[in-house]
Amino acid sequence: HSLVGSEMCIRDSLFTDAEKVVAVMRSDLGKMINKGAMDNGFYIPATGVAGGMRNITNSKRPIKTVADLKGLKMRTPPIDVTIRTFKALGANPQQVAYTETYMALKTKVVDGQENPFSNAVDMKFYEAQKYLSVVNWQVHPDPFYVNPAWYNSLTDDLKAIFDAVSEATMIYSDTIWLNSEVGYLNILKDKLEVNFMDPKDRDGFVTGVKGVWQYYVDQGYFSWDEINKALAIAGK
């Protein structure tokens, strides 16, 4: 439960854009959640985003509605929430190592993959894909972990400085990440057929994964109250 911040930020289809995720992570709720990591032996002074929103490429068809995912062999990382999500949405998730994803796409072992625009460009996934569907389904957090014993050895003045610098650095990192995504998307527009999912059709993702949300609530990772507070902060 103490790692609820990371779990909530990658929660499938919970937020519609990375800026809303950032708003939650920088809020009092986000800071309170980070403090809970102390129970697991971590101190987190700040959390950012590891790239932009994750979107879907594939070689079969544009993803305009949830129904278009049905039967697609989707490469996923070995992350439980990702696997559960694509199963819930009707796809056939296949765990493939990140470094082996390009070859898996090229040899048709999988039909598609999900990653931020930057990864799709840097790893040249577009060479083995035909469609990019901008669905903004998930974002991965980038928590800055430090040893609590080390942190607690600092004077109060040094703790304050460390916390302030950590937060400022993470804000700078987020700005660089999110600004760069626009350029990466423009590159992909020249390589792939791009479609942007209509907001009303994206609601199908939200409906389709509510059972996944409930699973993690039942497991004690977070509560519906925390989810609703996060959505209120994000203004969804």
What are these regions (language model features)?
Residues 16-41, 67, 199-202:
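Short, solvent-exposed loop/beta-turn-alpha elements that line the ligand-binding surface or hinge
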Residues 31, 163-167, 171-236:
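An extracytoplasmic/periplasmic, membrane-proximal ligand-sensing/linker region
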Residues 1-5, 9-10:
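Single conserved hydrophobic/aromatic residue that forms the stacking wall/gate
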Residues 31, 35-111, 119-122, 175-178, ...:
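Bilobed "Venus flytrap"/periplasmic-binding protein-like clamshell domains
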